UniProtKB/Swiss-Prot annotation:
Gene (UniProt): PUB29
GO molecular function, one term: ubiquitin protein ligase activity
Cross-referenced Pfam families: U-box (PF04564)
Annotated keywords: Repeat, Transferase, Ubl conjugation pathway
Pathway terms, separated by semicolons: Protein modification; protein ubiquitination
EC number per UniProt: 2.3.2.27
Annotated protein name in UniProt: U-box domain-containing protein 29
Every U-box domain range: 11-85
Job description of the protein: Functions as an E3 ubiquitin ligase.
Reaction(s) catalysed by this chain's protein: S-ubiquitinyl-[E2 ubiquitin-conjugating enzyme]-L-cysteine + [acceptor protein]-L-lysine = [E2 ubiquitin-conjugating enzyme]-L-cysteine + N(6)-ubiquitinyl-[acceptor protein]-L-lysine
Amino acid sequence: MGRDETETYITVPSFFKCPISLDVMRSPVSLCTGVTYDRASIQRWLDGGNNTCPATMQLLKTKDFVPNLTLQRLINIWSDSIGRRHNGDSPVLNPPSGREVPTKEEVNVLLERLMSLENLMKIVRFVKDSDSNREFLSKKMEFVPMLVDIIRTKKTKIELVIMAIRILDSIKVDRERLSNLMLANDGGDCLTAILLAIQRGNLESKIESVRVLDWISFDAKSKLMIAERDGVLTEMMKSISITESSDPSLIEASLSFLITISKSKRVRSKLIAAKAITKIKDILLTETLTNVAVTEKSLKLLETLSSKREGRLEICGDDNGRCVEGVVKKLLKVSTTATEHAVTILWCLCYVFREDKTVEETVERSNGVTKLLVVIQSNCSAMVRQMAKDLIKVLKFNSSALAAYETKTTHIMPF
């Protein structure tokens, strides 16, 4: 049923809205940065591995919440006054007409006219509203092919393509099925459209497009096909580049995609040639980038690339060993996962292959020996602790390392 024509729409004061969800806050809480969020929204943000304030991107010294009782009281007073003003009727706390979530019956009608930006936007609101809505659409066998046709059609406006990608990113249908649909006939038209969405879309559209690429990278064939598509790796290198406007969410999504496709040996060589290692070095050495997931995925991708000889040479030789410095810097500083990836990289460089002895000097100069001694006693896996022991056996024969053993770290000697 439609809304009554006399129904009143209320404009919500901006400071009553959560900066993340943009909805009226039900339980406002403030972080140590002073910014207030709805408790549920900020909890999801922090549970996702983030340790920064979403609004300011400042590193959080503590993740504790402080209930903003003053704001809660103001919201309650405002809400009560709105209710009294309208004699008990429930006001609509949303922008007028066209923003409400359509019903399932209305969606069934919308599916008959998908080549309309307005209709696609309504479906976006529908799938964003609940898990049951997403499941409802994902079970409609004809729905996904219709979205793929929108993306594939050359004359489709970019706005329609972006909305179709947004829906696909939300409903997460069967990977193999979607991959086969989008990459049929070498996937040319679909990949071209997704690249355009990455190039021309806003931040949200870029992230969604990258996630769809990641999702359809289903097997070795699809990973190679996507990686070899002109422009894909170029755009990914831009996405993980450190600039003033860099966004951690886009970097993380892009790294996840690169990790997925790097399982192919041919793709690893292409990533090395595209200077992915230089980009990773910049991420590791950027003090202001404190996102845990970004660091973990940067190190995981670097670990994968270190399996190739050209990758190891690039890591050791890049900017006089600065990449190795970045790896050592993250030991014990970010998370257990990050430490394990970092140790594996150093073990590969210094113990297994030892193609460049200068890397050992870089590890020692960066206080790597002391950190490795601590790793041995950490809660890292037994395999990683053994790698740390192997590394110390290699490094201990260097005279400068021996000096460290005899002075600062003798009390934690493993031998």
